[in-house]
């Protein structure tokens, strides 16, 4: 299969059955491999939607720098798209982010502004918003935490793909970062069948897992907790890494791997049948 541009390779990621971890033959566990997106994460979807929305609204100009607070994946996706679409990009991120992510951002031509690691992504958001407010002609912030295009990306792509490939879905479990995946895909699932359970995974307060957040510390405007049926706390991330790598051959990054155990716990302990 050939594509005109790399943008056409975003989305339509496969579902993989995790049969080893479900001792009950009436319960099917599927993982959606968002790492198959060109920049390696689900954030490719929202980056494309936010960029196209900003272009339609006339917010992007060649002389204006796109600025985004990010722990890594959204920034990487925006850096790639900015390079491809002819814009400059600056990632504002905690100094605690990995060297590998910084190198990848620079490889895409992005500038990086590091903020105090103790403040995490929340402080990076404050810094980015302040800079944009003080320099509106120099910077534009797409703001994944407030941007409705984030939710729309999952409502129009992630959700429909899952319904297409797993039409009998009974439970949808996803991590809580910006909340976009849960709000967008979850809304579609509820419209399709109100009985589908939408479950959020969040880290414990003070966790340093990049890409996920405990919503008591900061509640993104696009996220509505009441839209979820319930939430679960993360398990041990080291154990999750080993599980994903050794049993399923998935080289998962930290945010995905740490979601694996609570998702599987739902299936093992609480379901007699389901998908």
Regions found by a protein language model. Give the residues of each.
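PLP-dependent amino-acid enzyme catalytic core
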Residues: 1-275
């Amino acid at each position: 299969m050939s594509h005109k541009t790399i943008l056409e390779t975003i989305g339509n990621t496969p579902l993989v059955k995790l049969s080893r971890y479900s001792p009950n033959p009436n319960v099917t566990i599927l993982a959606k491999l968002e790492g198959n997106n060109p920049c390696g994460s689900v954030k490719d979807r929202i980056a494309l939607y936010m960029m196209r929305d900003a272009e339609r609204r006339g917010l992007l100009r060649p002389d204006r720098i796109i600025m985004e607070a990010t722990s890594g994946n959204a920034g990487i996706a925006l850096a790639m798209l900015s390079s491809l679409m002819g814009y400059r990009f600056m990632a504002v991120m905690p100094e605690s982010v990995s060297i590998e992510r910084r190198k990848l951002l620079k490889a895409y031509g992005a500038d990086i502004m590091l903020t105090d690691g103790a403040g995490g992504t929340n402080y990076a958001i404050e810094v980015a918003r302040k800079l944009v407010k003080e320099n509106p002609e120099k910077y534009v912030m797409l703001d994944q935490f407030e941007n409705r295009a984030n939710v729309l990306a999952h409502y129009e792509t992630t959700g429909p793909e899952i319904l297409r490939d797993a039409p009998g879905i009974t439970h949808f479990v996803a991590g809580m970062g910006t909340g976009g995946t849960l709000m967008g895909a979850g809304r579609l699932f509820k419209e399709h069948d109100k009985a589908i359970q939408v479950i959020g995974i969040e880290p414990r307060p003070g966790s340093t897992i990049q890409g996920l957040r405990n919503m008591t510390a900061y509640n993104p405007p696009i996220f509505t907790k009441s839209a979820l049926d319930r939430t679960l706390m993360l398990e041990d991330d080291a154990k999750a890494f080993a599980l994903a790598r050794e049993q399923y051959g998935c080289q998962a990054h930290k945010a995905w791997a740490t979601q694996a155990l609570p998702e599987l716990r739902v299936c093992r302990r609480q379901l007699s049948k389901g998908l």
